[in-house]
Amino acid sequence: MRPLTEEETRVMFEKIAKYIGENLQLLVDRPDGTYCFRLHNDRVYYVSEKIMKLAANISGDKLVSLGTCFGKFTKTHKFRLHVTALDYLAPYAKYKVWIKPGAEQSFLYGNHVLKSGLGRITENTSQYQGVVVYSMADIPLGFGVAAKSTQDCRKVDPMAIVVFHQADIGEYVRHEETLT
């Protein structure tokens, strides 16, 4: 377990900023304590400093995880967000997409969101912008990347993809043995 290097921090913060923008500061400076990001086995964990100090007594090879896994670095040093970060990203999301009940199951199985399943989309969402996907009952289901801008979504055909799938809460079941 070690702090992130400057390059790792920059790559991770750029990825998170695609979803929550300048609200990134609210993740680190919280009123209930100081939180930080730590790297362990190529995975980035979001952990309170109090728990981090307790975990310092455990050897690195025995430590499985600590805090909440936000994502991992790939072998090419790109950062991939995990669905476990959804609970922390959803309240601060700038751009949101709501999908119809009929499209929820398709999204939770790992498929992209089609125009026919789109309920609402935040105004001024640009193309390739990170979005948090909600059900019509305002339950966060996952996150993705907008394939079309808000204006383009109005005039595309119903079978066009409007949100590229990145992660969803169905991964808890599909990848339960590898999710830490």
UniProtKB/Swiss-Prot annotation:
Domain named PUA: residues: 94-170
GO MF annotation, one: RNA binding
Region (N-terminal domain): 1-92
GO CC aspect terms: cytosol; nucleolus; nucleoplasm; preribosome, large subunit precursor
Stretches the record annotates as C-terminal domain: 93-180
Tissue: Expressed in hematopoietic stem/progenitor cells.
Annotated effect of mutating A55G: Markedly reduced interaction with DDX24
CDD domains referenced in this protein's UniProt entry, alphabetically: Nip7_N_euk (cd21146), PUA_Nip7-like (cd21151)
Family according to the record: Belongs to the NIP7 family.
Keywords carried by this UniProt record: Nucleus, Ribosome biogenesis, RNA-binding
Record's function text: Required for proper 34S pre-rRNA processing and 60S ribosome subunit assembly.
UniProt subcellular location: Nucleus, Nucleolus
Pfam families named in the record: pre-PUA_NIP7, UPF0113
The keyword Nucleotide-binding is annotated on this UniProt entry: no
Effect of E171Q: In a breast cancer sample; somatic mutation
Protein's name according to its UniProt entry: 60S ribosome subunit biogenesis protein NIP7 homolog
GO BP: ribosomal large subunit biogenesis; ribosome assembly
